[in-house]
Regions:
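N-terminal hydrophobic targeting/anchoring segments and the immediately downstream early-domain regions
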Residues: 2-173, 229-239, 243-245, 250-374
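Active-site core of metal-dependent hydrolases
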Residues: 167-261
Length: 374
């Protein structure tokens, strides 16, 4: 993957657009009719999007308007995918994130330890948790897990949509589960304090990964199959097992929250959040938008490029059903998406303590249990 591909990839880290066309930033739009009590709660809360991209272009220095939008979003930290199918590309992506933080020390920090999340909130910076979704470069040499842990990558996904040496992804019809290499990788990640992410894994791989891990695991960005049956969504038995083992489930802001041709809305997303709370309990659910902080806007040229990328992904066998739909939830598309969700949770009768947990406290808790709280 070249530098252009990385910039395209970070624009929309969703399954629908891992290499999507360039998106445009727009000014922050305030949530409509956010009650003052919710606005105050949000301002004081630890807010973590468990899969999100910070900027539209890692090679172009962010403008003052872009940095203002990031700050005004109120988001404390994000889990940010930096992996590439190749070893060299992944190292280059890590260097790009390091450069972004070095060049904008007042706006960003890399979360290398659990206490850095609170530090990001205290210093009004966006904390970036570098993570992997691809595993090909690890398959060549699983010992690289430790090397990348030393580079600050402390969240790693075992599979993408297809099969890896570690297990089957969600699009594999055989649903073969974890391999011996996958079991060994989980043990190594547990020993190193690296979070295991099973978002794109098949049902059996996910279930076995939860059971094999000595520490809680993440499903950082997914949906509830009981609400809408889709390969990227997880059934209730997996959600229950995840919670029983102390894990975390992040609901994404993707079209896979509802059947086509219905346009997804915040109501559909909240249906998934509430269902997950009912199954998992209030201590295990959050938001992993699978989007970006900045507002996504596609012009005609970008839509054409998006279509080409969908065709490419389908040809490679990694495209999920329904990827050709709008790759975001229109009324949760922007820097304010987490605050809007907070207001929607309040409308559904959730108390302040639960809203704070969903906004970020649950993710913060599980990262502390996996990494240690130093």
């Amino acid at each position: 993957m070249n530098r252009r591909d990385f910039n395209l990839g970070i624009l929309k880290v969703s399954a629908a657009a891992l290499l999507s066309p360039r998106l445009l930033a727009r000014p922050l739009a305030s949530p409509d009719s956010t009650p003052p009590s919710i606005a105050a709660l949000y301002k004081n809360a630890i807010v973590i999007d468990s899969l999100c991209a910070p900027l539209v272009d890692m090679d172009t220095p962010p403008t003052a308007d872009v940095l203002a939008a990031v700050r005004q979003s109120g988001i404390t930290a994000i889990n940010f995918t930096i992996s590439d199918p190749t070893f060299e590309g992944t190292v280059g992506n890590i260097a790009s994130v390091e450069a972004l933080v070095e060049q904008n020390p007042d706006a960003f920090l890399i979360v290398r330890r659990h206490s850095d999340i609170a530090r990001a909130k205290r210093e009004n910076k966006l904390g970036i948790l570098p993570s992997f979704q691809y595993t090909a470069f690890l398959e060549e040499n699983p010992e690289r897990i430790e090397m990348f842990r030393r580079f600050g990558v402390r969240i790693m996904q075992l599979t993408y949509n297809n099969r890896s040496i570690f297990g089957d992804g969600c699009l594999e019809p055989g649903n073969a589960g974890l391999s011996k290499a996958g079991i060994a990788a989980i043990k190594k990640m547990n020993d190193l304090g690296v979070a295991v992410d099973l978002s794109h894994s098949g049902y059996r791989t996910t279930s076995e990964g939860i059971a094999q891990s000595a520490k809680p695991v993440l499903i950082s960005h997914s949906g509830c199959a009981a609400i809408y049956a889709h390969p990227r969504n997880k059934p209730d038995e997996i959600l229950k097992s995840l919670a029983d083992h102390g894990g975390y489930f992040g609901v994404y802001l993707m079209p896979y929250v509802v059947a086509s041709p219905t346009v997804p809305t915040r109501e559909h997303v909240l249906d998934h959040v509430m269902h997950a709370i009912n199954v998992c309990g209030v201590d295990h659910v959050g938001i992993g938008s699978d989007g970006s902080i900045q507002k996504t806007v596609l012009n005609a040229e970008q839509k054409a490029a998006f279509g080409q990328d969908i065709a490419r992904r389908k040809k490679l066998g990694i495209g999920a059903p329904g990827e050709d739909r709008c790759p975001y939830v229109p009324d949760l598309n922007g820097p304010d998406h987490m605050e809007v969700i907070a207001a929607e949770l309040a409308k559904r009768g959730q108390p302040a303590a639960v809203i704070e947990k969903v906004l970020g406290a649950n993710f913060q808790r599980v990262i502390g249990e996996i990494w240690g709280t130093g």
